[in-house]
A protein has these predicted regions:
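Catalytic domains of carbohydrate-active enzymes that cleave complex glycans
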Residues: 1-35
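Prokaryotic Sec-type signal peptides and long signal-anchor helices
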Residues: 5, 21-24, 135, 143, ...
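Compositionally biased non-globular segments, especially hydrophobic aliphatic-rich helices
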Residues: 6-11, 17, 52, 59-60, ...
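Intrinsically disordered, low-complexity repeat segments enriched in small/polar residues
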Residues: 10, 65-67, 160
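Predominantly extracellular/luminal regions of secreted and cell-surface proteins
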Residues: 30-68
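Residues that form or immediately flank small-molecule/cofactor binding pockets and catalytic motifs
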Residues: 50, 127, 139
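Aromatic, loop-rich ligand-recognition surfaces of beta-strand-rich domains
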Residues: 69-135, 146-185
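Short proline/glycine- and polar residue-rich coil/turn motifs
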Residues: 140-146
Length: 185
């Protein structure tokens, strides 16, 4: 199909039509094309801070449904957070689980006031109340990067039932935080 489409575009351009340049088309975000399997797949997510109803994606199942987002936050796979605490969720793994990594992807679209997080905290707990911090990292958010995607991960070995992921916006820029999946391996 693609080869035929390129030929059709060339023919149309030769006749003076201004078509979309298919050679510059990058297609879907590769991560969005392949469903994920991971330890948190289908697990309950407890929202310690709510997602925004305008960008609910698939609701409470979004962050553990195995579906990664495409290039735009309105595609139904990215969940948006604008409350004071931004992203603050706990994944109930149902049983004590050996965990080797926890990852979430974030997007930045400066023109829409969507920014990468200024800080991320990843924690684990046996009881859902007392958490042990695995990672706390602060970031400098560069608003000169108009569009950017970034994974923020912890890697190691730990056991726990509850995995908490927190991402905060910076005081300077504020704005939205969008993520598509909490990946636990």
């Amino acid at each position: 199909f693609y080869a035929r489409a390129l030929k059709a575009v060339t023919d149309l351009q030769a006749k003076g039509y201004h078509t979309f340049d298919l050679k510059s088309e990058i297609g879907s975000r590769p991560e969005s094309l392949q469903p994920l399997t991971h330890l948190a797949l289908g697990k309950k997510v407890i929202y310690n801070a709510p997602y925004n109803s305008s960008y609910a994606a698939q609701g409470d199942v979004t962050l553990t449904d195995g579906i990664r987002g495409d290039w735009t936050y309105g595609d139904g796979a990215w969940q948006g957070f604008i409350s004071k605490n931004r992203l603050d969720v706990t994944v109930d793994m149902e049983n004590e689980t050996t965990i080797h990594s926890v990852t979430a992807a974030f997007m930045q679209v400066v023109g829409a006031e969507v920014f990468l997080p200024a800080s991320v905290v990843i924690s684990v707990s046996d009881d859902g109340v007392n958490f042990t911090e695995l990672k706390h990292q602060d970031f400098v958010v560069n608003k000169e990067e108009a569009i950017k995607f970034s994974d923020v991960s912890w890697e190691g070995t730990v056991k726990g039932r509850y995995v908490r992921y927190q991402a905060r916006a910076g005081k300077e820029l504020g704005g939205w935080i969008f993520t598509d999946e909490i990946i636990v391996k």
